[in-house]
Amino acid sequence: MLPFDPSTRYDRQVRLWGEEGQASIGSTSACVLGSDSLATEILKSLVLAGVQSFYVVDDAKVEQADIGQNFFLHADDIGRSRAEATLEKLTELNPSVSGSASSQPPTALAMEDVEKLTTFSVVVAANQNEEIDTTFAKVLYNIRVPFICIKTFGLIGTIRICIKEHTIANSHEENPRPDLRLDAPFSKLIEMINETNLDEMTLEQLRHTPYILLHFKALEVFRKQRNDPEAFPSTTAERKELQAILMSFRRSSEESGTKDSENFDEAKAAVIRAFQRTTIGSSVKSILSSPQCSTSTRPFWLICEALRRFVTENNNLLPLRGTLPDMTSDSSRYTRLATLFHEKALSDAQEVLRLTREVEKERGVGDVISDDVCYRFCKNADRIRVQYGDVLDYNEETKAIVEKIRESNIDEETRNQKVDEATWMLLMRAVGRFQKEKGRYPGTNGVPVSIDAQDLKKRVEVLIREALKDEQDFTSISNKVTDTAIAEICRFGAAELHVISSYVGGIAAQEIIKLATNQYVPIDNTFIFDGHTQESATFKF
């Protein structure tokens, strides 16, 4: 048997979130409440991703209906503990992942073994009732363990992330602006700019000059024309003027007579993105001004305090990212530029590390931030984020949902063909209320859909009235929740459609990985998928 090599097994994942991200996944322990098809689809994706361990909690036994809904169960599993049966199959997917199961009711874990909950990186409730959801949400919110409620009901799926605070070390912003510091060049870069004389270059040298140097040379002319050493193009007209200066540097080829040159085309195309003031984004500003920077001993906030001090001491600039975009150039000048940027980024990171050691000493903690962590943090300093959440409160969320329905513009001609996502959210709340009061879900136990639809409609109306301060809005809002939609959710009969479980479970696992790696931005905080239209929406409650 070949030795296990994480970098080989998880090669594609490592390309997404790096070795440090995979290491975070490898230390993640997940507790999943439930073992139905939704739970196993979530766990399947986590096990294949390489989490350290998982723990399944469910007191259900395998029944005939489970065999048709869950690919991880077989006919000979009927009568067995469903948690144990799914555990058996899931651990076969990845031998490096350990798993365990408990046949106790999920509520017992929240009421009797809170200390055990603190050992998990995340707790997931798969198709649990509202009482279990709210019980775990309150306990886990206070001990800062992320809690995710996931439900599927027929063609509808929802995900609700409950977390007190989630820190993001790299949001992986799409198409980030290059950090070239055109308005604030560092000393070594200034030396190279001053050494560059376009007039003395041969045509071949000019056509292989990196466009960042062309930008700086065009900026010099731009400033001379204005007799202002601090001038910087900030309007469309000024950037067009700078583009014209750039293109005036071109020379004609004696052979072809044309001025075509790839590096000048790149320089012109990059002007809009490159010529932006080097500023700190609002998200990072709010983090650096947070009281947590001054008091917290958690690693993220320790290094954020060091970053805040660095910014204060360095003209309100973040550490240099240290990477260059691809550009046409000869190898010697591009290598020199890349080296200058890398060395400056390393120097900035070392200064942040020094400040971090100061903060650690002041707060009475050990060296919790390693050199590598500090360097990665500084490289992505403009992409740090923090999300804050509230404890799960279904009653408060219902008020927000009803307000969304009030604000929605529903087309009278198509309202029976397409149901608004907020309406589905309200119907899912009504389903939860129905289950709590009747001990079963609408459309089950052989009760005709028409009867349960009438019962469910009454609960929808009660929820709307509870959420409203003014009764006069009741009719207009309740009319937006059509009888067709109510009958449809009853028609589902609490069915678990594997295709919906697989899709929603995959998204949920992706969100868990975001929480585990502290990379990418998780859903904030509610997601709903409508299988009728294959459309989804997010809400912040």
From Swiss-Prot:
Q: What happens when the gene is disrupted?
A: RNAi-mediated knockdown causes the formation of an everted vulva in the L4 stage, with the subsequent rupture of the animal during the L4-to-adult molt. Loss of rfl-1 nuclear localization in a 1- to 2-cell embryonic stages.
Please name the GO terms of the biological process aspect recorded for this protein, alphabetically.
negative regulation of DNA damage response, signal transduction by p53 class mediator; protein neddylation
Q: Which residues form a coiled coil?
A: none
Keywords attached to this Swiss-Prot or TrEMBL record, sorted alphabetically, are: Ubl conjugation pathway
- Tree of life domain: Eukaryota
Q: Which GO terms describe its molecular function?
A: NEDD8 activating enzyme activity
Q: Which GO terms describe its cellular component?
A: cytoplasm
SUPFAM superfamilies noted in UniProt: Activating enzymes of the ubiquitin-like proteins
**Pathway participation:** Protein modification; protein neddylation
Subunit (UniProt): Heterodimer of uba-3 and ula-1. The complex binds NEDD8 and ubc-12.
According to its UniProt entry, the function of this protein is described as: Regulatory subunit of the dimeric uba-3-ula-1 E1 enzyme. E1 activates NEDD8 by first adenylating its C-terminal glycine residue with ATP, thereafter linking this residue to the side chain of the catalytic cysteine, yielding a NEDD8-rfl-1 (uba-3) thioester and free AMP. E1 finally transfers NEDD8 to the catalytic cysteine of ubc-12. Required for rfl-1 (uba-3) nuclear localization during early embryonic development.
Spell out the family assignment given in the record's similarity comment: Belongs to the ubiquitin-activating E1 family. ULA1 subfamily.
Q: This protein is called what? A: NEDD8-activating enzyme E1 regulatory subunit
Q: What is the lineage of its organism?
A: Eukaryota, Metazoa, Ecdysozoa, Nematoda, Chromadorea
